[in-house]
């Protein structure tokens, strides 16, 4: 079944839809922008990309849907864990999307999602309040 036909079926009646503030969002896996649109839908296309936080809380997991094995859903997804520094992680995601010939418009969305995940995993530095010395008379 073509992606356009699947989109016509799924676009208004999906269990992943969230309608808030006159906008429609989607919580489906491999939807990089969480937007209910044909371009970012993670269910209907033959090749999709998803970025998730790693289970141990360090690094990201890149989930790629392969073109081969469409009839075998259990083996159609490849999960790659990347646990490097931020620059190396983002460049490896960029290379994975480019070399495997995924949609070029998904590249920037995947990089932004991975960057936000890596930023959330950084430890937060607690700023100490400076105390003023008390006046002694």
From Swiss-Prot:
One of its GO terms (biological process) is translation. InterPro entries: Ribosomal_eL28, Ribosomal_eL28/Mak16. Its main location: cytoplasm. The modification N-acetylserine is found at residue 2. There is a cross-link at residues 58, 65 (Glycyl lysine isopeptide (Lys-Gly) (interchain with G-Cter in SUMO2)). Signal peptide: none annotated. Pfam families: Ribosomal_L28e. GO terms for molecular function: structural constituent of ribosome. It comes from the Eukaryota. GO terms for cellular component: cytoplasm; ribonucleoprotein complex; ribosome. Keywords: Acetylation, Cytoplasm, Isopeptide bond, Phosphoprotein, Ribonucleoprotein, Ribosomal protein, Ubl conjugation. Transmembrane segments: none annotated. It is found in: Cytoplasm. The modification Phosphoserine is found at residue 115. PANTHER family: 60S RIBOSOMAL PROTEIN L28. Component of the large ribosomal subunit. Belongs to the eukaryotic ribosomal protein eL28 family. Component of the large ribosomal subunit. The ribosome is a large ribonucleoprotein complex responsible for the synthesis of proteins in the cell. This is Large ribosomal subunit protein eL28. The lineage of its organism: Eukaryota, Metazoa, Chordata, Craniata, Vertebrata. The gene is RPL28.
